[in-house]
Swiss-Prot record:
Listed GO CC annotations: cytoplasm
Binding residues annotated for substrate, in chain numbering: R109, D146
UniProt keyword list: Acyltransferase, Amino-acid biosynthesis, Cytoplasm, Diaminopimelate biosynthesis, Lysine biosynthesis, Repeat, Transferase
Catalysed reaction, written as an equation: (S)-2,3,4,5-tetrahydrodipicolinate + succinyl-CoA + H2O = (S)-2-succinylamino-6-oxoheptanedioate + CoA
Record-stated family: Belongs to the transferase hexapeptide repeat family.
Gene Ontology biological process terms, A to Z: diaminopimelate biosynthetic process; lysine biosynthetic process via diaminopimelate
Subunit structure: Homotrimer.
Residue intervals passing through the bilayer: none
Group of enzyme by EC: transferase
Protein name (Swiss-Prot/TrEMBL): 2,3,4,5-tetrahydropyridine-2,6-dicarboxylate N-succinyltransferase
HAMAP family per UniProt: DapD
Organism field: Bartonella tribocorum (strain CIP 105476 / IBS 506)
Pathway(s) of this molecule: Amino-acid biosynthesis; L-lysine biosynthesis via DAP pathway; LL-2,6-diaminopimelate from (S)-tetrahydrodipicolinate (succinylase route): step 1/3
Localization per record: Cytoplasm
């Protein structure tokens, strides 16, 4: 039996008996939860992993470990803010106790105002502008997390992703069966866009400014008429749009309903050679 399998068994059993767990709980359960969160924090394990077939496998027991930590940890003063600012919370800062050597080894840039909670992993060459990374999240190498962006609990952000200013990536710990929101490698998410409810943005996709995608959002390919729910195909260029509404009872035209529109699809080489503005400008002016 592997070490991770042992941890999983302990966490699963503890979660089934979670009503008996509180801030006074000691021993194996507390040690297992704390160790699991430490492994998440270091990026040695992650809540979701992409399989060879392109599907994502979610380790539900890791989400359960995060939830158990809220029962185990009391409210306390959290230090580490700018100019000695502190908070009242159950989750310490990822940077608690860090010194220059720790930041050097981590290899990412964190500007003043960036908040990362313990158990979130940030890979080398990531740039964190003033932003918020919630617990259990995974931000892979070379990604830009721009100003006022939020990366929700257990969200998975790929390599060389650009999350523009004010972007919201949804978190999902409850309901427990829900999957985390996933942004795959080389995606561009435009300013003030939102991706939530376990939706997946596939590799190389471009979302223009102000695109909102949840599990009820219709994502319509303008060329083929195909409708996607919960997933944007790879190398798609997506902008906000609307669908004609049903007529009102009095026969008048009903209000249009929001949708997201795939205005074009490109191959990997075109995506690499073409600027984001060029990809969006040509089609949105039609």
């Amino acid at each position: 039996m592997t070490h991770l399998t042992q941890l999983e068994i302990i966490i699963e059993k503890a979660f089934d008996d979670r009503d008996s767990i509180n801030t006074t709980t000691k021993g194996e359960i507390r040690e297992s939860v704390e160790h699991t969160l430490s492994l998440l924090d270091k990026g040695e394990i992650r809540v979701a992993e992409r399989q060879k077939n392109g599907q994502w496998y979610v380790h539900q027991w890791l989400k359960k470990a995060v939830l158990l930590s809220f029962r185990l940890n009391p409210m306390q003063i959290i230090t580490g803010g700018i100019n000695g600012t502190h908070w009242w919370d159950k989750v310490p800062s990822k940077f608690s106790g860090w010194k220059e050597d720790d930041f050097q080894k981590a290899g990412f840039r964190s500007v003043p105002g960036a908040i990362v909670r313990h158990s979130a992993y940030v890979a080398p060459n990531v740039i964190l502008m003033p932003s918020f990374i919630n617990l259990g999240a995974f931000v892979d190498e070379g990604t830009m997390v721009d100003t006022w962006t939020t990366v929700g609990s257990c969200a998975q952000i790929g390599k060389h992703v650009h999350l523009s200013g004010g972007v919201g990536i949804g978190g999902v710990l409850e309901p427990l069966q829900a999957n985390p929101t996933i942004i795959e490698d080389h995606c561009f998410i435009g300013a003030r866009s939102e991706v939530v409810e376990g939706c997946i943005i596939r590799e190389g996709a471009v979302l223009g400014m102000g695109v909102f995608i949840g599990q009820s959002t219709k994502i319509i390919d303008r060329t083929t008429g195909e409708i996607f729910i919960g997933e944007v195909p790879a190398y798609s260029v997506v902008v906000p749009g609307s669908l004609p509404g049903k007529p009102l009872p009095n026969g008048e035209a009903g209000p249009n309903l929001y949708c997201a529109v795939i205005v074009k699809r490109v191959d990997q080489k075109t995506r690499e050679k073409t600027s984001i503005n060029e990809l969006l400008r040509d089609e949105t002016q039609c």
